[in-house]
């Protein structure tokens, strides 16, 4: 079974800087220029839809920085920003862990390592058993882009391939866990899982119990097109709490969601969208 690496960074600008959109581009630039974790460049450039890498937006005061309009975000010199990179690779990246002052096209930054976590995917099963009697709360830390077309029967997905239905701003349990399933399958090397993801999502919708939610849509800037126009998308933030009474199904959902708590869910995880946090709520706490 593969390993998941999660590295937390402190990122301090040494001058006033205008952050790029999305702000994850700062660390992405350092990887692609070979200055930080150069072995991850192949993962970044991969066209694989569910590739096992997540680069967070920069964070300030425990909130991720992302653009919701045309206004660029200016950060003052000396501000303590944070970032997380999570990935799975066969390469030994530990010798590549580095700190120091780095020049980027966005400014000069002092970068230090805050934390390093290495998780054996096989051992996620042990974590699953700890929470079988809990409700599951999925909290969206950054705007999350979930296409409901994931729940189309595979026989119809090709027919509606060109229909732009946007992203769900009120995602169902089935949609969330279907995306997590796809991330997990890619992580362990299982291919051609569209039919299974569809079935798993539909069954999870039918057999889940929603306890509560606080979800809201957010329009975010995800970059620029070839003409310099802003590319926008509508995603979701907030949280949803649910339970799955069927034990076998819940065990699977927990395993997939635990992997996604490192690698994110939805579109554009490689640039910071779809960051989630799992919270577990004792059933007796709910009235």
From Swiss-Prot:
Keywords: Antiviral defense, Endonuclease, Hydrolase, Nuclease. One of its GO terms (molecular function) is endonuclease activity. Gene3D superfamilies: 2.40.30.310, 3.30.70.1900. Its EC number is 3.1.-.-. It comes from the Archaea. Part of the aCascade ribonucleoprotein complex, minimally composed of Csa2 and Cas5a, which binds crRNA. Other possible components of aCascade in strain P1 are Cas6b (SSO1437) and Csa5 (SSO1443), while SSO1399, Cas5b (SSO1400) and SSO1401 have sometimes been seen weakly associated. Csa2 is probably the major RNA-binding subunit. The Csa2-Cas5a-crRNA complex also binds target DNA homologous to crRNA, probably forming an R-loop. Purified aCascade forms a filament about 6 nm in width. The aCascade complex was purified from strain P1. NCBIfam families: cas_cas6. CRISPR (clustered regularly interspaced short palindromic repeat) is an adaptive immune system that provides protection against mobile genetic elements (viruses, transposable elements and conjugative plasmids). CRISPR clusters contain spacers, sequences complementary to antecedent mobile elements, and target invading nucleic acids. CRISPR clusters are transcribed and processed into CRISPR RNA (crRNA). This is CRISPR-associated endoribonuclease Cas6 1. It comes from Saccharolobus solfataricus (strain ATCC 35092 / DSM 1617 / JCM 11322 / P2).
């Amino acid at each position: 079974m593969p390993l998941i690496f999660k590295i937390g960074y402190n990122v301090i600008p040494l001058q006033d800087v205008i952050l790029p959109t999305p702000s994850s581009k700062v660390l992405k630039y350092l990887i692609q220029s070979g200055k930080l974790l150069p072995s991850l460049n192949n993962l970044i450039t991969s066209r694989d839809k569910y590739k096992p890498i997540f680069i967070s937006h920069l964070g300030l005061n425990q909130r991720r920085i992302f653009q919701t309009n045309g206004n660029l975000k200016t950060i003052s010199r000396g501000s303590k920003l944070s970032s997380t990179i999570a990935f799975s690779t066969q390469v030994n990246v530990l010798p590549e862990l580095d700190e120091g002052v780095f020049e980027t096209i966005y400014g000069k930054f002092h970068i230090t390592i805050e934390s390093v976590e290495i998780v054996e995917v096989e051992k996620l099963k042990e974590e699953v058993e700890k929470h079988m009697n809990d409700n599951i709360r999925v909290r969206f830390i950054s705007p999350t882009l979930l296409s409901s077309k994931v729940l189309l029967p595979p026989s119809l997905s090709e027919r509606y391939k060109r229909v732009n239905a946007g992203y769900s701003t009120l995602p169902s349990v089935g949609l969330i866990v279907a995306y997590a399933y796809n991330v997990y399958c890619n992580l362990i090397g299982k291919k051609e899982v569209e039919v299974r993801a569809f079935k798993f999502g539909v069954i999870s919708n039918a057999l889940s119990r929603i306890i509560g939610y606080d979800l809201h849509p957010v329009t975010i800037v995800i970059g620029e097109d070839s003409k310099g126009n802003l590319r926008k998308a509508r995603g979701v933030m907030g949280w949803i709490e649910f339970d799955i009474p069927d034990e076998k199904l819940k065990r699977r959902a927990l395993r997939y969601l635990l992997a996604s708590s490192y690698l994110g869910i939805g579109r554009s995880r490689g640039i910071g969208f779809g960051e989630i946090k799992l919270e577990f709520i004792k059933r007796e706490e709910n009235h």
